[in-house]
Amino acid sequence: MEERILLDFNKKIEDILPYIHKYYPDADSTHIYKWEESNALEYKYINGEKYYFKNAAPNLFRIDSTCKKLKEAVDGEEKVGRKKIIKEHITEVLNEYNDTHNHLLTPYQATFTYRISIDNGMNCDTIKVWLPYPREDCPRQTDIKLLSCNNFIINQKSIHSSAYIEKKYHNNTTFKIKYKFTTYAEYHPLPNNLKHIAADTILFKEYISERAPHIIFSDKIKQKTDSIIGSETRPYFQARKIFESLRKEYPWASAREYSTIDNIPEYVLEQKHGDCGQISLLFITMCRYKKIPARWQSGFMLHPNYENLHDWAEIYIEGMGWIPVDPSFGVQEWGTTEEEKYFYFGGIDAFRMIVNSDWGGELHPKKIYSRSENVDFQRGECETETNNLYFNKWKYSFDVYLNK
């Protein structure tokens, strides 16, 4: 664990100052202290010395509102292209829903190629890898077909869908898999006749319960959730209040490895920022505390030119069923209607690949050594006959081609 933390916290003050001064030339020790105190500049003492998170400097200009404005004045707003894609796509999805009243809409055919390349110089005989593979049990993800891969085992039994491969190690060892599938957008508007009753606590016990170490109804979680919800008693609107609040209050920032965090939702409350998975776990925890069934879903987002790992959630609303919620995409401020603004509360775009239906499960075949990522499963996992191979021992890459 110490090695993992050292890889994440590997910057000294002299390493991060050039980036900070690029956008904030007058920043001095007083500013640094203020940012550290507000947790906008993440650091940790290791062996008596202060080290900053490897992405602390870029994160500062995402977390601190003043710094964010200074950077935008120089570079422009982040991810403008993705916002344009999302706006056009949501408009198309809503138009199609209004015409058809189907919940699965605007399908795309995706061709996905994934690679893991092992570093040279390993002292081992065999490499075992688990690669991400699209789930077959999700209605909005269909027609899955393997296109190329040798000597593999496909696992659909676990909450983590994977393709397992092993081969003899040599320098430049690379594992590759290619598959295609159809992916749909999904949309569930609020029904006019929704009765706003609580879900069956016995039937959905698993999804309203605590699950250590990350889904714990601590006093902090209870107090924060209650302050967000206030006097609202309807489950749908309780969850929507949480959804609306989290993105406003906890800006997105690059995250340290989940395996180094004792309790992720508590970490978000303390640090006042989080990435997609951290915010989703906080959302799930808050919903479960209020007896709203909630569960994890994750994989990849496939927005053209913005492809990346991504996590989100689902909640169960009596009279609607399970509906998707993406807390990190949040309220769409450009929207002029409720449907546009709250699209990601009850809706999700078609640019997704679903790999995981929960977090922290077992891989198949079972991994012998500890996982590099013990919460999520997206980048893959690797091990030899004697030990786990952490992320610094290999590289992953992927290509996506979308066709409508």
PLM regions with names:
Residues 278-367:
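Hydrophobic/aromatic-rich core segments of domains that either
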Residues 157-164, 169-270:
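Acidic low-complexity segments
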Residues 2-187:
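Intrinsically disordered, low-complexity N-terminal segments that are enriched in acidic
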Residues 348-404:
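Low-complexity, Gly/Ser/Thr/Pro-rich intrinsically disordered linker/tail segments
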